[in-house]
A protein has these predicted regions:
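Bacterial N-terminal signal peptides
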Residues: 6-13
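Positively charged n-region of N-terminal signal peptides that target proteins for export
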Residues: 1-4
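Extracellular/lumenal and peripheral-membrane lipid-interaction modules
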Residues: 18-243
């Protein structure tokens, strides 16, 4: 009787050890989204591994280098506007580099504000302010039940005169900062869509906990995301058997 009891205990520990040794590798998955007719590709890969107390850890990495290469077009699609009697804004060029756990975005923009007035029966269009500016924005990602979020902090604004004041203290600077953050956040959400990246059973039980930008191959921008997968050891073993 004692022998059988010891055998059962040994089998339980052996099964637990086998579960703890298993790692479910997530093969690279390519997703893409359109920016002005150009397909921007994001490649994501990762693994699910066992942790303490039968918890399973999720680790994902996404290569954002194609997003870096098409950043100017992405921001232009969200920020550019040309109102005849109002604001005209164009993104001339932009860069995004890793500064783990954040990333630093530098945008070169041209801005003008125009007003239309009627004089002597005709409309006169007059430029009120205009010039070039360089904005440096720190982007810090986070992750939670709702997915990836992005916080933006303006670190530096280079602009002369009244344009500098508009960007530093007016609503223009806030609007630009918020649109930059939402553009990058939306792009990463599309590239790290759990339903398309993970097996269905894992995606349905996954919760993201943390995210950070990291420097990948050749200094390219990657994002690393950690989380948990709430499945039983039996489900985890079943997923490995199906590979």
């Amino acid at each position: 009787m004692r022998f059988h009891l010891l055998l059962c205990v040994a089998l339980i520990f052996a099964a637990q050890a086998r579960t703890e040794d298993l790692v479910l590798k997530i093969a690279p998955v390519n997703t893409s989204f359109d920016v002005k007719g150009q397909a921007v590709k994001i490649t994501a890969w990762g693994a699910v591994s066992s942790g303490p107390q039968q918890q399973f850890k999720l680790a994902l990495t996404a290569d954002l280098s194609d997003l870096q290469d098409n950043l100017g077009a992405l921001l232009a699609s969200q920020l550019n506007r040309s109102d005849r009697c109002g604001e005209r804004l164009s993104v001339e060029r932009a860069t995004l580099v890793p500064a783990s756990p954040a990333a630093v975005l530098t945008a070169h923009v041209h801005y003008e504000r125009w007003a239309c007035v009627k004089a002597f029966g005709r409309e006169v269009v007059k430029r009120l302010v205009g010039g070039n500016a360089v904005l440096t924005v720190k982007l810090t990602p986070s992750a939670g039940a709702d997915g990836i979020s992005m916080a933006a902090e303006v670190q530096k604004i280079e602009a002369d005169g009244s344009l500098g004041e508009l960007l530093r203290s007016g609503s223009l600077g806030t609007t630009v900062k918020e649109k930059i953050a939402s553009s990058i956040e939306s792009s990463i959400r599309k590239g790290l869509d759990l339903k398309s990246t993970l097996p269905p059973a894992v995606a349905a039980a996954a919760t993201l906990r943390a995210a950070q930008f990291v420097s990948g191959a050749e200094g390219k921008l990657w994002i690393s995301v950690d989380g948990e997968v709430h499945i039983s050891p039996a489900q985890f073993q079943s997923l490995n058997l199906k590979r």
